[in-house]
Amino acid sequence: MKRIIYCILVLVIIFNGTGCKKESKPEDNFIKVYDDANGNKHFHPLSITTSESGDGYIVVSAFDSWRIQIMKIDNAGEFQWNYELPSNYVNAVPNLLKINGQNYLVCMDAIGLFTYVLKIDEASQNITQVSSFSDVLYPTYAYNSGQHIYIQNYDRMSFETGIHELSGDLSSITQSGSVNIFTDVEERIVNHITYNNNRIPFFISTTQNQNYIVMNGFYNYSFSMIFLNPDLSFAGVYNGQGFNSGASAISPISGNQFSIARFSYDNLYFNPNVSLSPTTIDITSSISAQGQSELDPGRSVLIKDLVIGGTSYKAYLSSTRSNQLLLSIYETSGGTLVGKKYLGKNIPITASDFIQTEDEGLNILVQAKIMGSIDRIALMKLSKEQLETIID
């Protein structure tokens, strides 16, 4: 990646919003599309996090199906460097692990299908292999709860969804659990990791007090949201209707309260404050939620905490059927919608990830489709002032 395309568009048109209360500096808000020197690669951005050095951000993307690229940008979104991992490392899970300020990547071996844990070495612009787990096939998600580190996977031999807790140094597995799918879903997994059709919304989370782990994956002939005890034994489940419904994203609030997005066939539903029972056996369609007919249920939904004007909110980032983004802001305690903003107008974009910046703005990682068919990594920056106008 040798150059950056700066989209020659007025920001107010790109962001499709109103003016700010105060004049923002040029670096406070922007959109940048990162081009590739070869021009023929298709990129799928996966995750953005702060750099180890604190002077920018690390972006992990897939390209040409399941290959992996790491990119470093500075705080103003300027390209610094990129590194394409050797071809044996594939299928990066869609989030980075941050442990003691350092960034780690979980991925898969292209031939053996087993799991690697890699450390991103910013100084050398390279990666260091930390560990490999030959019995953990098809990794699908990784999560650091602050107390424990987990990897989710699909076992193609036993038709099970597995979850594995790692040691603090990431060198070994301390305990494992699994749930039985009772059917072969390998074709669905392969389509997921090679970006052939829509991605599957795997995730791992916990209740706010970490009494339970929440895992979204295949279970009992369906796509299900499974609650696990701390020893990774089964506690309860919200089953999907086969593979046509289930949870899309979740974010803990307190106790057993969550913000959730769920899908059912061709529709998305949001509930920013709902009580879930970790020991129930139920179906996801029983979770009360409001329909979002303008949104594309086949695209990623992200739910994270977002601080605006000193107050913490729940932010939902989703993709519309018309190839825009929708940023919806809800009160954390009551779940009231306090504002929303549509982003993007001139080029089709899809939500990938977002992260709040040190200056209380928001970096939004997206896939931008240039000239109708060229998939590129792009970054949209909303300033603190722009966020404040959303909740006015």
Role assignments for model-derived ranges:
Residues 63-67, 109-114, 155-160, 218-222, ...:
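Short glycine/acidic-enriched loop and turn motifs that connect beta-strands
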Residues 350-392:
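Blade-level signature of beta-propeller repeat domains, shared across WD40, Kelch, NHL, RCC1
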Residues 1-46:
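Bacterial Sec-dependent N-terminal signal peptides
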Residues 48, 58-60, 70, 81, ...:
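Hydrophobic strand positions within the blades of repeat-based beta-sheet folds
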Residues 25-44, 69, 78-85, 125-135, ...:
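Aromatic (tryptophan-biased) beta-strands that constitute blades/sheets of beta-rich domains
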Residues 42-50, 89-98, 134-147, 184-206, ...:
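Repeated scaffold domains used in trafficking and secretory/extracellular systems
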Residues 35-68:
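Beta-strand-rich domains and repeat architectures in extracellular enzymes and scaffolds
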Residues 69-77, 115-125, 161-171, 223-231, ...:
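Beta-propeller blade signature
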